[in-house]
Amino acid sequence: MSEIKVGENETIESALRRFKRKCARAGVLSEVRKREHYEKPSVKRKKKSEAARKRKFK
């Protein structure tokens, strides 16, 4: 879990900005989106191979 300490003279806006940046770097939102719906292992493999194919031909 990402957490920050708010300084004495720090505004809530800047603390919130730091928290959002820390969450983005940790990949929290992408992980939530990925786990939002169950994905069968066969579908995961298919997506992974299609992504590899796109990278190869790009």
UniProtKB/Swiss-Prot annotation:
Ranges for region Disordered: 36-58
A GO MF term: structural constituent of ribosome
GO annotations of cellular component type: ribonucleoprotein complex; ribosome
Gene3D superfamilies, A to Z: Ribosomal protein S8
Source domain of life: Bacteria
GO process annotations (BP): translation
Biased composition (Basic residues): 43-58
InterPro entries: Ribosomal_bS21, Ribosomal_bS21_CS, Ribosomal_bS21_sf
UniProt keyword Metal-binding present: no
One Pfam family cited in the UniProt record for this chain: Ribosomal_S21
Keyword Ribonucleoprotein in annotation: yes
Similarity comment: family membership: Belongs to the bacterial ribosomal protein bS21 family.
Alphabetized HAMAP family for the sequence: Ribosomal_bS21
Name recorded for this polypeptide: Small ribosomal subunit protein bS21
Source organism of the structure: Clostridium kluyveri (strain ATCC 8527 / DSM 555 / NBRC 12016 / NCIMB 10680 / K1)
